[in-house]
C-alpha cells in the first residue's frame, strides 16, 4: 500500500510522461506570404524584373507578390517565372503528413494555354507528383504516380477576385498509405483519396508562379498566403471582405 509520500511521487512522475496517442500540437511550419515586404521568405525566389511585392491587391496582411510575365521568360516550351519552396526535413519524407495553402488573383482571365497554378515536383529527378492546371477559367487537379484526374472545376478560376487553394497530403511511395485531400475557395473538392504521392527517394518541393505553355500574350498573377502547416485551420486564410 502506497504511503501519502509515495502517491505524491507517483503522481509527479506521471505528470512528466506524455500521454500516449496525444495529437501533435498544431504548427505553422513556414510562411511565404511576403509580409516581410520582400522575397526573403523564399529561398527559391525568381530573379526577374517581372516580380514585385505589391500592396494594392492582397489576400491578407499588407503585402502580396505580383508577376507580370511574357515569353521573355521562355525556357524550352514553357514561360517560367516561379517561386520554389523546399520543405525542411521531414517535410516530404515517407510517412510525413502536411497541409499546404496558397491564394492567387488574376487581374484578367488566363488564355487557353495550359498554366500551372501550384504543383509539386521531385528534386533531382524533376518529375511532377501532383498539379493544379488551368486553361482560361477552368481548373483541374491531378496526381501523377500514376496519373489520375481527381477534380475538374470548370469556370472556377474567375478573374478579379482571390481564389484559395489548400492541399492535405501524406507523403508515401505506397499507394495504400499515401493520400491527398483538396479544398478550393473553402469547399472540399477532393475527398481523401489514396494514392502514391512520392515516386522515388528524392524529396518533393512546391512551385507557384507564372508557369505556362509559351505564348505571345503577356499575363499577370498575384500570389499571397503561401503556408505549410500541420492542420487545415493553420493554412486557412481569413474570410474575404466583400469585393475581394
Give the residues covered by each predicted segment.
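Serine/proline-rich low-complexity intrinsically disordered segments, especially terminal tails, linkers
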Residues: 6, 17-20, 133
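Bacterial Sec-dependent signal peptides at the C-terminal "C-region" and cleavage site
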Residues: 13-27
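Low-complexity, Ser/Thr/Pro/Gly-rich disordered linker/stalk regions
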Residues: 23-244
Amino acid at each position: 500500500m502506497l504511503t501519502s509520500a509515495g502517491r505524491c511521487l507517483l503522481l509527479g512522475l506521471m505528470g512528466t510522461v506524455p500521454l500516449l496517442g496525444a495529437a501533435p500540437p498544431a504548427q505553422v511550419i513556414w510562411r511565404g506570404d511576403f509580409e516581410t515586404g520582400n522575397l526573403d521568405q523564399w529561398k527559391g525566389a525568381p530573379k526577374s524584373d517581372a516580380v514585385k511585392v505589391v500592396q494594392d491587391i492582397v489576400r491578407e496582411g499588407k503585402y502580396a507578390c505580383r508577376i507580370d510575365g511574357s515569353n521573355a521568360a521562355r525556357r524550352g516550351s514553357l514561360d517560367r517565372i516561379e517561386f520554389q519552396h523546399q520543405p525542411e526535413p521531414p517535410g516530404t519524407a515517407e510517412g510525413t503528413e502536411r497541409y499546404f495553402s496558397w491564394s492567387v488573383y488574376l487581374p484578367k482571365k488566363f488564355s487557353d494555354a495550359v498554366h500551372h497554378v501550384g504543383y509539386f515536383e521531385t528534386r533531382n529527378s524533376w518529375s511532377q507528383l501532383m498539379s493544379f492546371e488551368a486553361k482560361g477559367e477552368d481548373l483541374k487537379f491531378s496526381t501523377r504516380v500514376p496519373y489520375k484526374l481527381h477534380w475538374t472545376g470548370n469556370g472556377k478560376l474567375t478573374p478579379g477576385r482571390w481564389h484559395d487553394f489548400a492541399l492535405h497530403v501524406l507523403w508515401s511511395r505506397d499507394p495504400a498509405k499515401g493520400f491527398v485531400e483538396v479544398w478550393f475557395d473553402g469547399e472540399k473538392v477532393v475527398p481523401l483519396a489514396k494514392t502514391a504521392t512520392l515516386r522515388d527517394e528524392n524529396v518533393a518541393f512546391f512551385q507557384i508562379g507564372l508557369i505556362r505553355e509559351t505564348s505571345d500574350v503577356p499575363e499577370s498573377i498575384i500570389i499571397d498566403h503561401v503556408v505549410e502547416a500541420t492542420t487545415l485551420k493553420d493554412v486557412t486564410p481569413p474570410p474575404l471582405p466583400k469585393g475581394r
